[in-house]
Swiss-Prot record:
PTM (free text): Phosphorylated in the cytosol and extracellular matrix and unphosphorylated in the nucleus. Phosphorylation is necessary for nucleocytoplasmic transport and may be catalyzed by a nuclear isoform of CK2 and can be augmented by calcium. Phosphorylated (in vitro) by FAM20C in the extracellular medium at sites within the S-x-E/pS motif.
Biased composition (Basic and acidic residues): 143-159, 217-227, 275-287, 346-358, 420-442, 453-478
Tissue expression pattern: Expressed in tooth particularly in odontoblast and ameloblast.
Name this protein carries in UniProt: Dentin matrix acidic phosphoprotein 1
Species annotation: Rattus norvegicus (Rat)
GO MF assignments: extracellular matrix binding; Hsp70 protein binding
UniProt keyword list: Biomineralization, Cytoplasm, Extracellular matrix, Glycoprotein, Nucleus, Phosphoprotein, Secreted, Signal
Entry function: May have a dual function during osteoblast differentiation. In the nucleus of undifferentiated osteoblasts, unphosphorylated form acts as a transcriptional component for activation of osteoblast-specific genes like osteocalcin. During the osteoblast to osteocyte transition phase it is phosphorylated and exported into the extracellular matrix, where it regulates nucleation of hydroxyapatite.
Length: 489
C-alpha cells in the first residue's frame, strides 16, 4: 500500500509541479547556442540530450525536495569534492544540493526500496554523463554542423525514449523513489531552484528553445540548399559547355567536309586540265609527225639523186681499171717496147682521156637528171592534160546526156500530144455515138410509153377478173395458177 501511495504521489508531482531550475539551464544552453552560432551552428543533439537529462534530474530533484523533512540532514557536505570534479569535467557550474543519503521516511520504511532507487539513479546518471560528454565534444568541434543536424532527428526520439524509460522505471520501483542521485553530473538542482512554481514560464522557455532550434534548422537547410543550387548551376554550365563543344565539333566537321569537297573539286579540275594538256600535246605530236612525213615525201626524189651519184662514182674507178687493162693488153699485142717517156706520155694521154670520160659521164648524168626532170614535168603535164580531157569528156557526156534527155522529153511531149489528139478524136466519136444513142433511146422510150399506156387498161381489167375468180374459188391472192392448190405447198 505504501508503494502504491508513493507512486500516485510521484505521478501527481510530475504532472503539477514545475521546475524553476529548468529555466536557468535552458537560458544557459540558449546563451551557449547563440555563442556557437557566431562561428557555426552547434549540434542540437547534445542540447536535446542535455535537456532530457535535466528533465529526469528535475523530476528526481522534485521528489527529493518533496520528501525532504524540515529537520532532515543533508549529506551534501561530504560530497563537495565530487561536485568540484564534476564541474571541471562538464563545464557547468549549476549544481544543486545533493542529498545522497536517505530521507527520514526511507529510514523508517527500510532498505529494499532504497536499493531499487539506487539502480534507477545509476541509469539516469549514465545517460546524463553521456549527454555531457556529447556536449563537450560538440563544443570542441563546432564545424561539423551538417552531420549533427542529420543526427538531431535521430537523437531526439531516442532522448525522449530514455526519459520515458527512466520515468517508467521510477513508477515500477516500490520502495522510496527519491534514491541516491549521481555524484555531481549536472542533473542535481539547488534548493533555490525549487522556489518558483510558475508552469507558464517553463513552457514559454521550452517554446523559445524549440523556435530557436527550428531557426537553426532553417538556416542549416538554407545552407544545404545553397550548395545544391550552386551544384545545379554548375551542372547546367557543364551541360551548356558540353553542348557548345558538340556544336563546335559539328562546325569543324562541316568545315572539314567543305574542305574535302573543295579539294575534290580542285583535283577534278586539275585532272581535267592535265587531260586537256595531254590531248593538246598529242595533237601537236600528230601534227609534227604529219609535217615530218610530208617533208620525207618531199625529200625522197631528191634523195634518189645522191644515191645514183654515189653508185656512179663507185663505177668510175672500175671503168678506169678496165681502161688501163685494155691499154696494157694493146701494148702487149703490138709487141712494142717503148721507152719510159713514151710510157709517161701514154699515161698522161690515158689520164686525159679518163678525165674526158669523166666529164662526159658527168654531163651525161646531168643530162639524164635533166631528162628525168623533163620527163616528170612531161608526165605531170600529161596528167593535167588527161585530167582536162577527162573533164572535157565528162562535160561532153553531160552535154550529150542533157541533149538526149531533152530529145527524149521532146519525143515524150510529141507522143503525149498525139495521144491527146487521138483521145480527143475518140471522145468526139463517143460523143456522137452517145448522142445517137440518146436519140434512139428517146425514140424507144416514147414508143414504149405509148405501148404501155395502151396495155395498161387491158392489164387492169384482167387483174380484176382474176381477183373475182380467185375469190370465187377461195384462192389466195398470190396464187396465179388455175389449180386449186396454193403455190408454195
Amino acid at each position: 500500500m505504501k508503494t502504491v501511495i508513493l507512486l500516485t504521489f510521484l505521478w501527481g508531482l510530475s504532472c503539477a509541479l514545475p521546475v524553476a531550475r529548468y529555466q536557468n539551464t535552458e537560458s544557459e544552453s540558449s546563451e551557449e547556442r547563440t555563442g556557437n552560432l557566431a562561428q557555426s551552428p552547434p549540434p542540437p543533439m547534445a542540447n536535446s540530450d542535455h535537456t532530457d537529462s535535466s528533465e529526469s534530474g528535475e523530476e528526481l530533484g522534485s521528489d527529493r525536495s518533496q520528501y525532504r523533512p524540515a529537520g532532515g540532514l543533508s549529506k551534501s557536505a561530504g560530497m563537495d569534492a565530487d561536485k568540484e570534479e564534476d564541474e571541471d569535467d562538464s563545464g557547468d557550474d549549476t549544481f544543486g544540493d545533493e542529498d545522497n543519503g536517505p530521507g527520514p521516511e526511507e529510514r523508517q520504511w527500510g532498505g529494499p526500496s532504497r536499493l531499487d532507487s539506487d539502480e534507477d539513479s545509476a541509469d539516469t546518471t549514465q545517460s546524463s554523463e553521456d549527454s555531457t560528454s556529447q556536449e563537450n565534444s560538440a563544443q570542441d568541434t563546432p564545424s561539423d554542423s551538417k552531420d549533427h543536424h542529420s543526427d538531431e532527428a535521430d537523437s531526439r526520439p531516442e532522448a525522449g525514449d530514455s526519459t520515458q524509460d527512466s520515468e517508467s522505471e521510477e513508477y515500477r520501483v516500490g520502495g522510496g523513489s527519491e534514491g541516491e542521485s549521481s555524484h555531481g553530473d549536472g542533473s542535481e538542482f539547488d534548493d533555490e531552484g525549487m522556489q518558483s512554481d510558475d508552469p507558464g514560464s517553463t513552457r514559454s522557455d521550452r517554446g523559445h528553445t524549440r523556435m530557436s532550434s527550428a531557426g537553426i534548422r532553417s538556416e542549416e537547410s538554407k545552407g544545404d540548399h545553397e550548395p545544391t543550387s550552386t551544384q545545379d548551376s554548375d551542372d547546367s554550365q557543364d551541360v551548356e559547355f558540353s553542348s557548345r563543344k558538340s556544336f563546335r565539333r559539328s562546325r569543324v566537321s562541316e568545315e572539314d567536309d567543305r574542305g574535302e569537297l573543295a579539294d575534290s573539286n580542285s583535283r577534278e579540275t586539275q585532272s581535267v586540265s592535265t587531260e586537256d594538256f595531254r590531248s593538246k600535246e598529242e595533237s601537236r605530236s600528230e601534227t609534227q609527225e604529219d609535217t615530218a612525213e610530208t617533208q620525207s615525201q618531199e625529200d625522197s626524189p631528191e634523195g634518189q639523186d645522191p644515191s645514183s651519184e654515189s653508185s656512179e662514182e663507185a663505177g668510175e674507178p672500175s671503168q678506169e681499171s678496165s681502161s688501163e687493162s685494155q691499154e696494157g693488153v694493146a701494148s702487149e699485142s703490138r709487141g712494142d717496147n717503148p721507152d719510159n717517156t713514151s710510157q709517161t706520155g701514154d699515161q698522161r694521154d690515158s689520164e686525159s682521156s679518163e678525165e674526158d670520160r669523166l666529164n662526159t659521164f658527168s654531163s651525161s648524168e646531168s643530162q639524164s637528171t635533166e631528162e628525168q626532170g623533163d620527163s616528170e614535168s612531161n608526165e605531170s603535164l600529161s596528167l593535167s592534160e588527161e585530167s582536162q580531157e577527162s573533164a572535157q569528156d565528162e562535160d561532153s557526156s553531160s552535154q550529150e546526156g542533157l541533149q538526149s534527155q531533152s530529145a527524149s522529153r521532146e519525143s515524150r511531149s510529141q507522143e503525149s500530144q498525139s495521144e491527146q489528139d487521138s483521145r480527143s478524136e475518140e471522145n468526139r466519136d463517143s460523143d456522137s455515138q452517145d448522142s445517137s444513142r440518146s436519140k434512139e433511146e428517146s425514140n424507144s422510150t416514147g414508143s414504149t410509153s405509148s405501148s404501155e399506156e395502151d396495155n395498161h387498161p387491158k392489164n387492169i381489167e384482167a387483174d380484176n377478173r382474176k381477183l373475182i375468180v380467185d375469190a370465187y374459188h377461195n384462192k389466195p391472192i398470190g396464187d396465179q395458177d388455175d389449180n386449186d392448190c396454193q403455190d408454195g405447198y
